[in-house]
Amino acid sequence: MGLRTTKQMGRGTKAPGHQEDHMVKEPVEDTDPSTLSFNMSDKYPIQDTELPKAEECDTITLNCPRNSDMKNQGEENGFPDSTGDPLPEISKDNSCKENCTCSSCLLRAPTISDLLNDQDLLDVIRIKLDPCHPTVKNWRNFASKWGMSYDELCFLEQRPQSPTLEFLLRNSQRTVGQLMELCRLYHRADVEKVLRRWVDEEWPKRERGDPSRHF
């Protein structure tokens, strides 16, 4: 009763072997970190975040089109090159040579201060611009256009001196051409005609009679 039979002993010895065979047949998961890194790199490639090398930079630079090629391409498409050289300035009239003696080169543009030296002309302008008529623009409109305040206009009207003369004195640095523009603006063709005649006829005589003004 206490002794095991051969069959019973065989069963006892086969149990461990059967368990060992079962363990060998089961797949064992590979946990080697080196192998895992290679497998992951195949599925998910790692991006290179390093700066490009000098050779790569040179290659990129060489592959870029030159400025001349880009300019020619823009011209072929019919569009001007906006990044090119700035447009040249409008050519001026070079018909007059150096030391030219024509009237347009010798004469400077007269100012109102030059006009104030001609008493006869001042009298004519004063007679035309001093009177106050409801439908005619006079010195008040001229002075207001050039920035004179309402209080100043009223003050000049109260003075015994001609308000037109005061207006011209305060704007003596302006040109006679600017004064003629005011005449055209307010439809005072009569005053503009007087000024135009003085600029074309009297002013050249006065300017040429004093050569020291050119130096």
From Swiss-Prot:
Impact reported for L122R: In ECTD11A; severely impairs NF-kappa-B activation and acted in a dominant-negative manner
Ranges where the Death domain occurs: 123-202
Subcellular location(s) per record: Cytoplasm
Basic and acidic residues composition-biased segments: 17-28
Region (Disordered): 1-41, 62-86
Chief localization: cytoplasm
Summary of the tissues where the protein is detected: Detected in adult pancreas, placenta and fetal skin, and at lower levels in lung, thymus, prostate and testis.
GO BP field: cell differentiation; signal transduction
One cellular component (GO) term of this entry: cytosol
Domain of life: Eukaryota
UniProt-listed InterPro entries: DEATH-like_dom_sf (IPR011029), Death_dom (IPR000488), EDARADD (IPR039200)
Keyword tags: Cytoplasm, Developmental protein, Differentiation, Disease variant, Ectodermal dysplasia
Involvement in disease: Ectodermal dysplasia 11A, hypohidrotic/hair/nail type, autosomal dominant: A form of ectodermal dysplasia, a heterogeneous group of disorders due to abnormal development of two or more ectodermal structures. It is an autosomal dominant condition characterized by hypotrichosis, abnormal or missing teeth, and hypohidrosis due to the absence of sweat glands. Ectodermal dysplasia 11B, hypohidrotic/hair/tooth type, autosomal recessive: A disorder due to abnormal development of two or more ectodermal structures, and characterized by sparse hair (atrichosis or hypotrichosis), abnormal or missing teeth and the inability to sweat due to the absence of sweat glands.
Function: Adapter protein that interacts with EDAR DEATH domain and couples the receptor to EDA signaling pathway during morphogenesis of ectodermal organs. Mediates the activation of NF-kappa-B.
Assembly notes: Self-associates and binds EDAR, TRAF1, TRAF2 and TRAF3.
Protein name per Swiss-Prot or TrEMBL: Ectodysplasin-A receptor-associated adapter protein
Phylogenetic lineage: Eukaryota, Metazoa, Chordata, Craniata, Vertebrata
Annotated gene: EDARADD
